[in-house]
């Protein structure tokens, strides 16, 4: 008997019942669900096998590791058995968005947990959306148990990297689940050895009970690894725990220990009350749980029955369950004599003492089937109990017969009603309650009381009558290929008889509201299981939902009177939507209770109730409008929706208005007519026919109006109208009760005014488009609260169309996306008046009849969802089917990649270019002499190059030779995965190519005689041909519909001769290389069909090497050449550029079929990626029977310049170099280029190795390439060794790209290699593609501490110095040569500029010749023109952040010729002409520009504003000193500005010449000062000034007045006074920002400068809007 615990009963806290609502499981023998687990149990299967003799063991482990440890242990080979997975668990790396290196750095148990967690969460119906339920990611806890590590803590014997910490620290087991699923609640990883699962579940239950989390996922994992496995086997064996003959034998006489197993189990839990309230499917309920240390006083690992009894009794007590009600125990049952004895003893003590004989306690343990999964064993046991709950059956105990019962247990079974069953039987109990026991070798153990979930029925919602109508269904996946597989799984599942037992409404609820939403999806509507299967087989169009759903908005348009009459109480929506029904009933209840509307006007009530009900329905489904518009009568409902009127007041006013109309207007002969003609033409006719007294009642749109008049007047007007406009449409509106919005309603206005005055109106809570005013009324607009608003609305012209146009215009001006439109009413006539942009949509809400209500609304809802709108599917189902429950659905079809264990150090390769001992040759070397005929068919840039298809053929041949010795039988097919070009293009004019394979990873590599250089890497797979053909057939329904464009007149049809004449600019194909006979290119240029008769003769085609006799490269070329042709003829490129293959995601090819067919039909499509520098496409091939026989998916082709390709081949360089663009002296070029290129190549090499990439794209951030926090540390350590000049710790920013990283790593430039202004353009060679790309900050200039640029200072700024636009005290020095007309001109340089220009690179010439140059492109707001500084360039403006407008920079027009300004007034005129031309060509919607500039640019801007007020809207200057300030002479100014520009070569020389001439033109020109002082600036001006003064170096020996060269603006008033004297009232503001003149655009100050500039532009535009 257990000790007396009665005195402690009060201390036991109440246990909060916890619902198990989701489960995921893995076990040996392919167990991956409750169904497969149940099959194992009822079929009495055992998944145990002897390690030494089983191929599964040899695939996963090195037998020598075991042999070394167990050598000397008798009969060890016979002793070692286990229940292992057939294969090491892999990972769908793409699904979890992991880089290759990050995935390789994860522990295999972490990978397994991610997938099982996904399945458990899907089973629970967790969608990852914060919807106010207990499924709140911020309070979702994760508790995971484990007992082993993949890599032992001492890493000395194993290869380690930055991920060693992630792999070995157990905290990452729970952490990875939190990270990848976005769960932010408590997270814990525990280790109590074999009782880990129940401990983790206990921790989760306690956290749920205390409110630490509202949902939790908990369980355990155990995988035996080749790294730690041998040692753990050895330790357990030496401890005597392992059975000597094989499988665990719970309760049997021959049990001597346990058999190890692998597995994983996770359960998702909520508090029972939450699960019931939120409609979760409840697998079981944890009623009580107790964890205690139960070790024997003598030995820690010896179980103690007395202590177990105490824990079990406490678990039962806190559960509140009668022990007699517990009918089953899933025992820990490892099969050890002492363990089984202690456990059975405790069960009898607590549960069987006073038990009736006819209520026996059944005991079982699944360890006899699956072994002991150690840390995962507890969840295995719990999964078994849940499977029993679902089936209400008890499975047999494996290998049990009463005669085999352990003799030590027999007394307990004889004395107590306790049993073990040997045959499956029903679980007959009024309440099925079970105990789950889970014990650990460390003494920690626990018991769990679990009750079946069907006992706790969810709260039923309001009973809404249902009709046989379609329901929505959504299926989504990460990519198209996976979605195709998932659809196939659904089709098979729907055809299973058991699925028909699941209500269709539950399936709809589960697919739409209880699943993760992925980017690639389909949505369908179906009214039965078979209908759903049929719709899925028809392959509905896929939807790309990767865009942010919150970006799309919707507006409501409420219908007016005159449409089809629909009684909302007869609508199918009334029987389907609770929110619609409640809203409609409320309207009728208000009217009937207060008699607000007469029976004669019931049609008006029906229309109002219908529209109000539809509005409430849409809002309940998560479709909330951003704007409301109502056509005539519809504006009443719009005002209710906006909160201006209550429902009661709106109905009251409509009732009064209707009664007044009947009483006073029916005798008035007013009629209405709709006219389809432009408003201007109708107004013209109205003006001409005033005598008819016809009035304009409604402006529906620009081309539709409604007129009012007497029948006679309308007919007369119609006749005259059709004479002038015979095509005009005319329709008399006979169903209108009165001629509203005209003089015919004048008799009711006085009384209606009194009624309106009695109604309380409220500020609008939404945007309303006023038909009365013809404009948009923002939130809270007081005009809607005027009591005469509805009176005027009744009488005056309704300008619905004008209001719509005003709203759309305002959206354009504010750059607000235009919403989609839903018409709220019984038709879709009103939204036809709304003109939409190309990407806008419009939808109806209700069909024309009552029967169309639900189908129309559902179709609109799913179209909205497909278009990217947010739909709250949970609220939808709460509305239409509140009793819906989550149910089982097909599991997500993950695409697993094999797990690779860390290698032993001695197996580590010495060099990446040499084959290590574990690599084998799969194909003989192929000499270049045999390849030569193939190369002659593939000539690029004048070189015979090895084509990609030859590489593919070599890899397929290697895969085939590997498969020949395997178990594959019959016809085979082949797959390649992740083919990457490592070394670019191979010129194999001599030498050889060879394929080698890594045994550990199965990775294939193509190497050459060039120091075993690796050219290609890939993975290969061999499969049965029939399996591949079935897989490929899934794509066929998605491809064939596109065949229709072949017959369209817009399709380009190219025969062979024309096709290859177009293709020759890229590749010159020989006779055997021209495999395409005809090509059809669609109008969009992104799709093509092709036809090739090349197959058939390919086997005997000339030039196929012997080793490739069954893998003809040209035959393969016939299946994929079309994609290269399509990209190179359709993608944007310049002459001398080509798109070349550098990566292939997947290739599937049935070669036997390809050899048999007489021809192939090809379909190819692609999209632009990487900013247009690459294309990503697919190409599929059909044989002559229409069967899909090959697919090349995710073919990536990168842009490359042909001359660059030549250079790479000539020099043997890799295609990842960056070309140095700094122009330096000729004697310095080689030294600087070599140093920069050497560093750059090393950095790229480090990044490629760390990120496991074949290339480092320039346009992606390092984070996008896979650089995570741990990899960044690793990379930083390696890069620090490359940059000894750095003394600080290197921090790598994942948000930066390669250029930013190189900028950090490169040392400060020496005096010999000073960066130039043109370095704001970085010339890159990405994948062999030379391009000029702007970077975020210009290059650095050295400056001293006081801010002046010097030739030997420290680089702390990124801006080229520029001349400041000032005169000196109004007294110009006459350095210029006066012309005869008295105008001063600057001295022209004596040295020619041609030599300087000749030294510039073509890229630099292109950069400085782009004038004007678009710095930022964001159309809409007034463009900003920024004029160059004194150095003649506008590169500094690239440092600015986003200004929300188009920004244009102007270089000095004479920069290339070495010519500066001759006269500032003449130069200003030239710049004005450039600006006018740009406006005319590129900004047709703008007549003026905002202008500005830094330094001299500001001076020119002020001048332009004074001279050309018709062109300039406003000016913003950046540190431009006003004229008349400072004390420098022209000579002194020149010496200051030219001081840092001691060099005179290349671009440096051009900038120096600009400074010389611009300084003289400005400082030596008295005309400028006189003109600008005497000219009024009539545009607004905003001034930005640097806070600190500029201090020239003492070595220049300037006068004291030089300290005033730039004013000290520490006091803003100083600057304001100075500028006020020049600008007057048009000066809107002066802003002082940190820094001095030369630091305005440095990285430290660029953000501040940007913010100041944005503020200045906003102030100017605000002033202009107010003034205009």
From Swiss-Prot:
Segments forming domain Carrier: 1234-1322
O-(pantetheine 4'-phosphoryl)serine carried by residues: 1269
Chain positions covered by the region annotation Proline-rich linker region: 1339-1399
GO biological process annotation, one example: secondary metabolite biosynthetic process
Region (N-terminal hotdog fold): 905-1034
Residues annotated as domain Ketosynthase family 3 (KS3): 15-452
Malonyl-CoA:ACP transacylase (MAT) domain: annotated segments: 555-863
Keywords (A to Z) from UniProt: Phosphopantetheine, Phosphoprotein, Transferase
Comment field on protein domains: Multidomain protein; including a ketosynthase (KS) that catalyzes repeated decarboxylative condensation to elongate the polyketide backbone; a malonyl-CoA:ACP transacylase (MAT) that selects and transfers the extender unit malonyl-CoA; a product template (PT) domain that controls the immediate cyclization regioselectivity of the reactive polyketide backbone; an acyl-carrier protein (ACP) that serves as the tether of the growing and completed polyketide via its phosphopantetheinyl arm; and an alpha/beta hydrolase superfamily-type thioesterase (TE) domain. An extraordinary feature of PKS1 is a repetitive proline-rich region (9-20% proline residues) between the ACP and TE domains.
Protein role: Non-reducing polyketide synthase that synthesizes the universal anthraquinone precursor atrochrysone carboxylic acid from malonyl-CoA. Produces a mixture of both 3R and 3S enantiomers with an excess of the 3R form.
Protein name (record): Atrochrysone carboxylic acid synthase PKS1
Organism per entry: Calonarius odorifer (Mushroom)
Lineage of the organism: Eukaryota, Fungi, Dikarya, Basidiomycota, Agaricomycotina
């Amino acid at each position: 008997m257990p000790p007396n615990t009665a005195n402690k009963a009060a201390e036991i806290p109440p246990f909060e019942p916890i619902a198990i609502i989701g489960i995921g499981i893995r076990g040996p023998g392919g167990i991956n669900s409750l169904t497969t687990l149940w099959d194992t149990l009822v079929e009495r299967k055992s998944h145990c096998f002897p390690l030494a003799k089983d191929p599964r063991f040899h695939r996963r482990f090195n037998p020598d590791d075991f042999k070394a440890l167990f050598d000397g242990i008798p009969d060890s080979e016979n002793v070692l058995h286990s229940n292992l997975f057939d294969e090491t668990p892999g990972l769908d790396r793409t699904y979890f968005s992991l880089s290759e290196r990050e995935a390789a750095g994860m522990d295999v148990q972490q990978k397994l947990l991610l997938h099982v967690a996904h399945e458990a969460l899907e089973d629970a119906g967790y969608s990852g959306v914060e919807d106010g339920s207990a499924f709140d990611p911020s309070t979702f806890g994760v508790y995971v148990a484990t007992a082993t590590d993949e890599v032992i803590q001492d890493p000395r014997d194993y290869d380690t990297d930055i991920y060693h910490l992630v792999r070995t620290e157990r905290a990452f087991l729970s952490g990875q689940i939190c990270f990848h699923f976005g769960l932010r609640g408590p997270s814990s990883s525990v280790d109590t050895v074999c009782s880990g699962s129940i401990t983790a579940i206990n921790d989760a239950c306690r956290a749920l009970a205390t409110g630490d989390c509202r949902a939790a996922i908990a369980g355990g994992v155990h995988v035996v690894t080749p790294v730690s496995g041998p040692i753990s086997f050895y330790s357990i064996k030496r401890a005597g725990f392992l059975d000597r003959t094989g499988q665990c034998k719970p309760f049997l006489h021959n049990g001597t220990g346990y058999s190890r197993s692998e597995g994983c189990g996770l359960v998702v839990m909520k508090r029972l009350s939450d699960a019931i309230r939120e409609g979760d499917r409840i697998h079981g309920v944890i009623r009580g749980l107790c964890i205690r240390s139960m070790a024997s006083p003598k030995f820690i690992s010896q179980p103690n029955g007395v202590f177990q009894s105490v824990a079990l009794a406490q678990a039962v007590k806190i559960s509140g369950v009668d022990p007699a009600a517990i009918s089953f125990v899933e025992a820990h049952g490892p099969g050890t004599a002492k363990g089984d004895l202690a456990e059975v003893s405790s069960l009898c003590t607590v549960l069987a003492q006073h038990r009736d004989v006819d209520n026996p306690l059944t005991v079982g343990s699944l360890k006899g089937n699956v072994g002991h999964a150690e840390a995962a064993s507890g969840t295995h046991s719990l999964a078994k109990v849940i499977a029993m709950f679902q089936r209400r059956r008890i499975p047999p105990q494996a290998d049990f017969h009463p005669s085999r019962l352990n003799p030590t247990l027999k007394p307990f079974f004889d004395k107590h009603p306790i049993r073990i069953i040997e045959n499956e039987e029903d679980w007959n109990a009024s309440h099925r309650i079970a105990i789950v026991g889970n014990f650990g070798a460390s003494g920690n153990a626990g018991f769990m009381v679990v009750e079946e979930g069907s006992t706790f029925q969810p709260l039923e919602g309001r009973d809404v009558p249902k009709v046989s109508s379609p329901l929505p269904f959504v299926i989504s996946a990460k990519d198209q290929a996976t979605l195709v597989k998932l659809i196939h799984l659904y089709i098979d599942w729907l055809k299973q008889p058991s699925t028909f037992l699941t209500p269709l409404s539950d399936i709809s609820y589960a697919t739409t509201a209880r699943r993760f939403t992925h980017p690639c999806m389909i949505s369908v509507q179906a009214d039965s299981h078979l209908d759903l299967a049929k719709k899925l087989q028809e392959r509905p169009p896929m939807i790309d939902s990767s865009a942010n759903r919150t970006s799309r908005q919707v507006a409501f348009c409420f219908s007016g009177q005159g449409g089809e009459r629909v009684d909302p109480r007869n609508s199918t929506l009334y029987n389907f939507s609770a929110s619609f029904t409640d809203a409609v009933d409320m309207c009728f209840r208000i009217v009937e209770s207060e008699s607000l509307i007469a029976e004669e006007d019931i049609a008006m009530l029906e229309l109002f109730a219908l529209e109000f009900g539809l509005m409430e329905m849409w809002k309940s489904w998560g479709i909330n409008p951003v704007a409301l518009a109502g056509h005539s009568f519809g504006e009443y409902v719009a005002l209710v929706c906006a909160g201006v009127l209550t429902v009661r007041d709106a109905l009251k006013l409509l009732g009064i208005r209707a009664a007044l109309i009947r009483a006073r207007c029916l005798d008035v002969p007013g009629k209405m007519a709709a006219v389809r003609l432009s408003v201007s033409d109708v107004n013209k006719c109205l003006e001409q026919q005033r005598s008819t007294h016809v009035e304009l009642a409604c402006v529906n749109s620009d081309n539709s109006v409604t007129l009012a008049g007497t029948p006679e007047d309308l007919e007369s007007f119609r006749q005259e109208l059709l004479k002038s406009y015979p095509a005009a449409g005319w329709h008399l509106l006979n169903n209108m009760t009165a001629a509203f919005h005209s003089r015919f309603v004048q008799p009711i206005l006085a009384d209606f005014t009194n009624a309106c005055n009695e109604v309380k109106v409220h500020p609008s809570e939404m945007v309303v488009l006023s038909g009365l005013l013809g404009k948009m009324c923002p939130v809270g607009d007081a005009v809607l609260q005027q009591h005469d608003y509805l009176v005027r609305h009744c009488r005056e012209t309704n300008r619905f169309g004008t209001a719509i146009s005003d709203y759309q215009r305002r959206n354009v001006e504010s750059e607000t996306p235009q919403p989609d439109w839903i018409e709220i009413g019984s038709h879709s006539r009103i939204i036809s008046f709304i003109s939409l942009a190309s990407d806008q949509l419009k939808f109806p809400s209700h069909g024309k009849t009552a029967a169309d209500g639900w189908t129309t609304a559902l179709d609109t809802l799913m179209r909205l969802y497909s278009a990217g709108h947010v739909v709250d599917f949970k609220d939808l189902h709460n509305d239409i089917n509140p009793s819906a429950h989550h149910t089982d659905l097909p599991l997500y079809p993950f695409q697993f990649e094999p797990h690779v264990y860390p290698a032993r150090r001695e197996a580590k390769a010495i060099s990446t270019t040499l084959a290590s001992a574990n690599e084998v040759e799969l194909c003989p070397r192929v000499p270049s002499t045999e390849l030569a005929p193939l190369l002659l068919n593939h000539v690029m840039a004048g070189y015979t190059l090895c084509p990609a298809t030859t590489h593919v053929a070599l890899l397929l041949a290697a895969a085939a030779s590997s498969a020949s010795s395997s178990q594959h039988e019959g016809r085979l097919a082949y797959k390649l995965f992740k083919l990457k070009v490592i070394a670019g293009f191979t010129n194999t004019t001599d030498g050889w190519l060879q394929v080698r394979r890594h045994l550990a990873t199965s990775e294939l590599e193509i190497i050459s005689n060039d120091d075993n250089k690796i050219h290609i890497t890939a993975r290969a797979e061999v499969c049965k041909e029939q399996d591949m053909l079935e897989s490929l057939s899934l794509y066929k329904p998605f491809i064939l519909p596109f065949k229709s464009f072949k017959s369209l007149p817009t399709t380009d049809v190219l025969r062979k001769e024309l096709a290859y004449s177009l293709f020759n600019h890229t590749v010159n194909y020989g006779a055997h290389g021209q495999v395409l006979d005809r090509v059809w290119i669609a109008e969009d240029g992104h799709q093509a069909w092709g036809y090739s008769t090349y197959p058939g003769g390919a086997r005997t085609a000339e030039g196929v090497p012997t080793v490739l006799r069954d893998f003809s490269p040209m035959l393969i070329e016939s299946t994929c050449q079309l994609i290269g042709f399509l990209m190179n003829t359709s993608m944007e490129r310049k002459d001398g550029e080509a798109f070349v293959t550098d990566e292939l995601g997947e290739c599937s090819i049935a070669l036997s079929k390809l050899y048999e067919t007489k021809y192939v039909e090809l379909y190819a499509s692609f999209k632009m990626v990487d900013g247009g520098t690459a294309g990503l496409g697919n190409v599929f091939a059909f044989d002559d029977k229409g069967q899909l026989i090959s697919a090349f998916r995710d073919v990536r082709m990168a842009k490359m310049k042909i001359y660059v390709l030549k250079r790479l081949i000539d020099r043997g360089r890799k295609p990842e170099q960056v070309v140095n663009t700094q122009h330096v002296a000729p004697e310095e070029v080689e030294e600087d280029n070599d140093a920069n290129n050497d560093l750059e190549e090393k950095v790229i090499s480090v990044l490629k190795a760390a990120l496991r990439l074949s290339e480092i794209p320039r346009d992606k951030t390092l984070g996008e390439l896979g650089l995570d926090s741990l990899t960044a540390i690793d990379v930083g350590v390696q890069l620090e060794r490359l940059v000894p000049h750095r003394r600080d710790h290197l921090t790598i920013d994942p948000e930066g790209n390669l250029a930013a990283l190189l900028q950090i790593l490169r040392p400060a430039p020496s005096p010999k290699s000073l960066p130039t202004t043109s370095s704001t353009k970085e010339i890159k060679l990405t994948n062999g593609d030379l391009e000029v790309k702007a970077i975020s900050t210009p290059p650095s200039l050295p400056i001293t501490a006081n801010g002046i640029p010097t030739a030997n200072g420290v680089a702390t700024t990124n801006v080229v110095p520029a001349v400041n636009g000032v005169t000196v005290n109004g007294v110009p020095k006459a350095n210029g040569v006066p012309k005869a007309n008295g105008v001063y001109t600057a001295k022209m340089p004596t040295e020619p500029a041609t030599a300087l220009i000749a030294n510039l690179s073509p890229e630099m010439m292109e950069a400085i010749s782009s004038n004007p140059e678009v710095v930022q492109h964001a159309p809409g707001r007034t463009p900003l023109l920024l004029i160059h500084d004194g150095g003649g360039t506008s590169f500094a403006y690239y440092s600015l952040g986003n200004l929300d407008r188009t920004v244009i920079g102007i270089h000095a027009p004479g920069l290339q010729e070495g010519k500066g300004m001759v006269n500032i007034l003449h130069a200003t005129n030239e710049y004005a002409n450039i600006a006018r031309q740009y406006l005319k060509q590129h900004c047709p919607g703008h007549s003026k520009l905002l202008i500005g500039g830094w330094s001299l640019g500001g001076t020119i801007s002020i001048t332009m504003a004074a001279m050309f007020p018709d062109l300039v809207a406003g000016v913003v200057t950046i540190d431009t000193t006003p004229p008349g300030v400072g004390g420098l002479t022209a000579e002194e100014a020149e010496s200051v500005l030219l001081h840092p520009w001691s060099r005179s070569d290349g671009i440096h020389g051009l900038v120096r010449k600009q400074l010389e001439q611009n300084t003289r033109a400005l400082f030596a020109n008295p005309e400028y000062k006189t003109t600008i002082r005497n000219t009024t600036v009539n545009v607004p001006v905003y001034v930005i000034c640097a806070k600190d003064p500029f201090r020239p170096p003492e070595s220049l020996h300037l006068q004291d007045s030089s300290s005033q060269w730039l004013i000290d603006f520490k006091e803003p008033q100083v600057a304001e006074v100075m500028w006020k004297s020049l600008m007057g009232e048009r000066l809107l503001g002066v802003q002082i920002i940190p820094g001095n003149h030369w630091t305005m655009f440095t990285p430290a100050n660029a953000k501040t400068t940007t913010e100041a500039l944005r503020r200045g532009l906003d102030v100017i535009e605000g002033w202009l809007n107010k003034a205009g």
